[in-house]
């Protein structure tokens, strides 16, 4: 017997006024997740999901496009104010932050939460170009 096709259920609109934007910018990609105060994800996007492939994902423009996309998704849930947590060494940090501010959010605080090892794991070998 064939299984019944599952219905695609649209997530219900939450009415959340403020949240936290987690901007994770690595050397290869930039991901932006907007959560509520408890840490439940409301909207997310990345340079890869916006159609950028390969080395184009790590550009500031790709991070800006991803930030504009996630801002539009979060504003559908009624979000107006954001705290921004920026992590990682990538080039998309500042452009993602500027795009979030330009899309109409009131940014209350900006924190750098990049993890710094206290001489933990051995780093990978140096690149010779």
Swiss-Prot record:
Disulfide bonds: none annotated. The keyword Calcium does not apply. GO terms for cellular component: ribonucleoprotein complex; ribosome. GO terms for biological process: translation. Keywords: Ribonucleoprotein, Ribosomal protein, RNA-binding, rRNA-binding. It comes from the Bacteria. SUPFAM superfamilies: Translational machinery components (SSF53137). Belongs to the universal ribosomal protein uS11 family. Located on the platform of the 30S subunit, it bridges several disparate RNA helices of the 16S rRNA. Forms part of the Shine-Dalgarno cleft in the 70S ribosome. Part of the 30S ribosomal subunit. Interacts with proteins S7 and S18. Binds to IF-3. This is Small ribosomal subunit protein uS11. It comes from Rhodopseudomonas palustris (strain HaA2).
